[in-house]
Amino acid sequence: MSIKVIVAGFKGRMGSTAVDMIKNDSELELAALLDPFAAEKEIDGVPVFTDKSDLVGLDAEVWVDFTIPKVAYENTHFALENGFRPVVGTTGFTQEQIADLMTLSADKKLGGLIAPNFAIGAVLLMEFAAKASKYFPDLEIIELHHDKKKDAPSGTAVKTAELIREARAYKKQGAADEEETLVGARGAEFDGFRIHSVRLPGLVAHQEVIFGAQGEGLTLRHDSYDRISFMSGVNLGIKEVVQREQLVYGLEHLL
């Protein structure tokens, strides 16, 4: 039997790519599409909604969310309250919001996934970076995205930094008497190292973690050249959350 899926934010680039992926998988079925700016009533027989409250009672199992940070938490909370298992690629959640959603999902016995990045290569980069940081504690993260991205740093960069913090002993990087002659030149500070965000047209999603040591350096990099790179992770997430009873943060928990 097919897994019935709602896609919130289907008008966006990630949402529309997810719709195409679901249509092309015989194990998945589009149950509904949601976007506040939609003018259509249905697309190829799939009902279209502009208000999530109209989805209460809908026969669906999974809620895929590619919306915007300011509504993603509310959407995910709504999904869990109404029996939909969330698979969320929207970034910008606080740690408190993630913890709240984990608690709610456990109470409801519903699986779910919030993933800063759905590309398998990006998840591997995070894992490799955490491992390398034990031996190369001096590092900087540079994330590069298209110029329409609303949050900075990216969710991928934040998740990478959190994994590094768990693996690396704290170290304040850089000169003790370092001074910025231009405010912000050294980027954002996280656990003693720096994160830099680049926003340019033509980019999709890219990240480097650069490590330095005496006489050597190590650079780990992942590039998503097309949004199709995220769909294997979204597909995996949809099929995994229906078998689980609590939300997880990070695709690595499903690999």
From Swiss-Prot:
Catalytic site positions: 145, 149
GO molecular function, one term: oxidoreductase activity, acting on CH or CH2 groups, NAD or NADP as acceptor
Catalytic activity annotation: (S)-2,3,4,5-tetrahydrodipicolinate + NAD(+) + H2O = (2S,4S)-4-hydroxy-2,3,4,5-tetrahydrodipicolinate + NADH + H(+); (S)-2,3,4,5-tetrahydrodipicolinate + NADP(+) + H2O = (2S,4S)-4-hydroxy-2,3,4,5-tetrahydrodipicolinate + NADPH + H(+)
UniProt xrefs under InterPro entries: DapB_C (IPR022663), DapB_N (IPR000846), DapB_N_CS (IPR022664), DHDPR_bac (IPR023940), NAD(P)-bd_dom_sf (IPR036291)
Pathway: Amino-acid biosynthesis; L-lysine biosynthesis via DAP pathway; (S)-tetrahydrodipicolinate from L-aspartate: step 4/4
Cellular localisation: Cytoplasm
CDD domains from the UniProt entry: DHDPR_N (cd02274)
CC terms in the record's Gene Ontology section: cytosol
The enzyme's E.C. designation: 1.17.1.8
GO BP terms in the entry: diaminopimelate biosynthetic process; lysine biosynthetic process via diaminopimelate
Keyword NAD set for record: yes
Keyword NAD: yes
Record: residues binding (S)-2,3,4,5-tetrahydrodipicolinate: 146, 155-156
NCBIfam families, per the entry: dapB (TIGR00036)
UniProt family annotation: Belongs to the DapB family.
HAMAP family: DapB (MF_00102)
Known role: Catalyzes the conversion of 4-hydroxy-tetrahydrodipicolinate (HTPA) to tetrahydrodipicolinate.
Name this polypeptide is given: 4-hydroxy-tetrahydrodipicolinate reductase
Organism of provenance: Streptococcus mutans serotype c (strain ATCC 700610 / UA159)
